[in-house]
Amino acid sequence: MAYRKRGARRETNLKQDERMQEKEDSKNINNDSPKSQLSEKVLSKKEEIITDNQEEVKISDEVKKSNKEESKQLLEVLKTKEEHQKEVQYEILQKTIPTFEPKESILKKLEDIKPEQAKKQTKLFRIFEPKQLPIYRANGERELRNRWYWKLKRDTLPDGDYDVREYFLNLYDQVLMEMPDYLLLKDMAVENKNSRDAGKVVDSETAAICDAIFQDEETEGAVRRFIAEMRQRVQADRNVVNYPSILHPIDHAFNEYFLQHQLVEPLNNDIIFNYIPERIRNDVNYILNMDRNLPSTARYIRPNLLQDRLNLHDNFESLWDTITTSNYILARSVVPDLKELVSTEAQIQKMSQDLQLEALTIQSETQFLTGINSQAANDCFKTLIAAMLSQRTMSLDFVTTNYMSLISGMWLLTVIPNDMFIRESLVACQLAIINTIVYPAFGMQRMHYRNGDPQTPFQIAEQQIQNFQVANWLHFVNYNQFRQVVIDGVLNQVLNDNIRNGHVVNQLMEALMQLSRQQFPTMPVDYKRSIQRGILLLSNRLGQLVDLTRLLSYNYETLMACITMNMQHVQTLTTEKLQLTSVTSLCMLIGNATVIPSPQTLFHYYNVNVNFHSNYNERINDAVAIITAANRLNLYQKKMKSIVEDFLKRLQIFDVARVPDDQMYRLRDRLRLLPVEIRRLDIFNLIAMNMEQIERASDKIAQGVIIAYRDMQLERDEMYGYVNIARNLDGFQQINLEELMRSGDYAQITNMLLNNQPVALVGALPFITDSSVISLIAKLDATVFAQIVKLRKVDTLKPILYKINSDSNDFYLVANYDWIPTSTTKVYKQVPQQFDFRASMHMLTSNLTFTVYSDLLAFVSADTVEPINAVAFDNMRIMNEL
């Protein structure tokens, strides 16, 4: 804006003044140097004869003075000329550089969000897998026999202070990420190598388990014969197929649940027809065809298009800014480019003739033509439509002395609702129009606007101006706001009907003609003529401006039909800059060629919006489910910020590190209030009911620890050899770890340990396995005592399981010297579930075949009428001026 540029100029003036001062100082120094030489000569002992005429000296001083003054004046002239050139260059530079920087990275992130059904399931969901474990004799030596147990597939606990509860929360998160929308067993079935008649089993992991069991020497003959008989059973009349699978009972429950609660729905032509936005279906400019009959097995997954349950527009400034920015960039990419604009050179030549610039020396009118080019016009067209589609706030940049910019700004403020501009920018622009054009026309005094006044300059002017046409136009601009209309369940920001049909431009022209007829009594004649010529330039293009307004409205409304999230209007943190000279370019260069979005562009825009919206809702459901799970697992305080961060990361477009903490916690509070989706709740209940089974199958989670003051012997165990393990807690005093952590009362446990009574702390906790005999001798498990007796902490408790057998290092120390190893702790660990082939064989049922289509609009072939014949909502051509 104007006052900013003045500041910039003042800085350059100061810098140049400093340079001038430096130059003068250097000259003074040079003038002083002969004086110093003269004094040296006087003081020197050398004899020199000096003869100088006094008059000559005086004359030369005067000449020097006059030369100095002339050079000063010359420098002043040069300085002002240089300043003027800089100003002109700055203006030209400002007006020709486009304000928009395309951010391809955000656009790519948005377009890369694909519907989840694109991820094809190739395996069943599994937490467990059967593993062959050795058996150890009484003396710790390994036998040749093996035994099968169910163990965890991913048995990983991170290092450091870690609660087993976090393991279950991460497991739940992993299940949510892998939870399929549908399962088609036929697609994942593989051949059973051991089958007699080339039968198939449900997936590759089932086939691998069958192979391993078949090759195991200890497998019974009956089981081998059964594996040879395993194959699919097809019921073609019911479109159903049954596949044999080998699954842990918990895994079977998961997969059975996924099969029973698939999200696929039958797909037919009616659904595709209704999927296309209604306004595009009913738009006579678009010709849509569906020439494909879908098979009865066609399926689709309905996108989750619930409206924004978090209300991100309310009190989430930085998040809302990011969303609107990404929507703006996407919208700019789909707004069509203007075609057949008027030649810039020809238009400037015509404008010069209208202005009679050859006969004029007024510099202000040459500014009218500065910066007019077709790139700026196209940029302005895209910016206006994209900003309205994304509800991005705009700021106006202009020079007050360029009357043509201000007159173009009058068209802009007429067509675009006031809410779209940042308040300060709107006030500055309106004030410039009032004080440069409107008030001088009627001979009124300049408006002195108070900063912070609730009324805008136009609202004040409306009450003071007597002229009906001008006051009528001001009234329209003051009340020009979006109408909020719900269409197909989506809140749309709709333009006023007078703007849509272009009638408002006639209203603007009436006001402008009234202004040009006024006398401008307090201003010079040249000023009046400049304004009149500027108005003349715009009024000569009345027909084109009406067409431009209709074209702008049509493109905005057509693209708006493809938006699926409510268009909430809230001022954004950052703004999109709009140069008023680019608005002048648009007004003066718009041709009569109609441009409308191509059907392919519309479908692309619609698909990207649907995919983002659906992904947004799914991620909300995940976050709500994980917050509920964290609450149920007593991890609410510990995990909350990371849950919200993960939620934002999965939305793809956010730079999570830069989101302020207050918005993170506000987001957490909003997520807490939402109900959990039923599928996700059922999945958590499945995990919660079977936590003990999962703990038993892990090699890193124990069910408790026994602590004694005196050493306890390591016992013999078939699974491990010599081990400090307890399979039951008979005869031990038991204390619940949960209650101990909750109460913080360590007196009971400390007294028992000091009285030489062993105590069992019962509860899930992580442990470490060590098979080195040397470390068993070296360690006295001081870590366990220190945590409890001294530090009084059990949340970081991590006991060591000593496992000594023929696979261990230094096993000979035990075997050869009949040494009985001891430990002050015992790990309470229940035996994992043994693998039973018959109990693990399940038949899974699914549809024999169906095809899931993700891109429904691929079936629609679309074309447009000739753009010249395209009509607007009032059934009249968009562009009438031919």
Curated annotation (Swiss-Prot):
Q: Which GO terms describe its cellular component?
A: T=2 icosahedral viral capsid; viral inner capsid; viral nucleocapsid
A Pfam family in this protein?
Answer: Rota_VP2
Indicate the annotated site residue(s) for Interaction with the intermediate capsid protein VP6.
Answer: A222, F226, M230, M841, M843
Q: Which UniProt keywords apply?
A: Capsid protein, Inner capsid protein, Repeat, RNA-binding, T=2 icosahedral capsid protein, Ubl conjugation, Virion
* Spans annotated as 5-fold hub: 1-82
Domain of life per record: Viruses
Kindly list the residue ranges recorded as spanning the membrane: none
- Protein family membership: Belongs to the rotavirus VP2 family.
Please tell me where this protein is predominantly located. virion
**PTM annotation:** Sumoylated with SUMO1 and SUMO2. Sumoylation of viral proteins seems to have a positive role on viral replication.
Q: Show the ranges annotated as biased composition (Polar residues).
A: 28-39
Q: Name one GO molecular function term.
A: RNA binding
Q: Where is this region: Disordered?
A: 1-47
Q: How does it assemble?
A: Homodecamer; each decamer is made up of two conformers of VP2, called VP2A and VP2B. Interacts with a VP1-VP3 complex. Interacts with the intermediate capsid protein VP6. Interacts with NSP5. Interacts (via N-terminus) with NSP2.
Taking the record's annotation, the residue ranges forming a coiled coil are none
Explain the purpose of this protein: Inner capsid protein that self-assembles to form an icosahedral capsid with a T=2 symmetry, which consists of 120 copies of VP2, with channels at each of its five-fold vertices. This capsid constitutes the innermost concentric layer of the viral mature particle. It encapsidates the polymerase VP1, the capping enzyme VP3 and the genomic dsRNA, thereby defining the core.
Span list, region Hydrophobic: 396-416, 424-444
Record localization: Virion
Extent of Basic and acidic residues compositional bias: 9-27
Supply the name of the protein.
Answer: Inner capsid protein VP2
**Annotated domain remarks:** The N-terminus binds RNA. It is necessary for encapsidation of VP1 and VP3. The N-termini of 10 VP2 molecules form a cylindrical hub underneath each 5-fold axis of the inner capsid.
